[in-house]
Curated annotation (Swiss-Prot):
Entry's localization field: Plastid, Chloroplast
Name recorded for this polypeptide: Small ribosomal subunit protein bS18c
Organism: Physcomitrium patens
Subunit structure: Part of the 30S ribosomal subunit.
Name of the encoding gene: rps18
GO molecular function: small ribosomal subunit rRNA binding; structural constituent of ribosome
InterPro entries on file: Ribosomal_bS18, Ribosomal_bS18_CS, Ribosomal_bS18_sf
Pfam families hit by this protein: Ribosomal_S18 (PF01084)
Record-linked SUPFAM superfamilies: Ribosomal protein S18
Amino acid sequence: MKQAINKSKRSSRRRLPPIRSGEIIDYKNINLLRRFISEQGKILSRRMNRLTSKQQRLMTIAIKRARVLALLPFLNNEN
C-alpha cells in the first residue's frame, strides 16, 4: 500500500535544464565548466548533471581542453 501512495506523490514538475538555450559549451567558459566538475576536480556523470549524451561529450572535451591550457586544475587538492 505504501509504495503505491509514494509513487503517486512524485512531482510531475520538470526540472530546469542544466544548460540554458543561450549558453555555448566552450573551453573558455570557465564558470559553466565548473558547474559540471566535482570538488575534487572530477567530471560529473551524466546522471548527476542531467545532460544529454551529446552535451556530455562536448562538456568532457571542453573540460579536458581547459585542463590542458591550465584554465582548470587536473586535481583540486586544497588539503
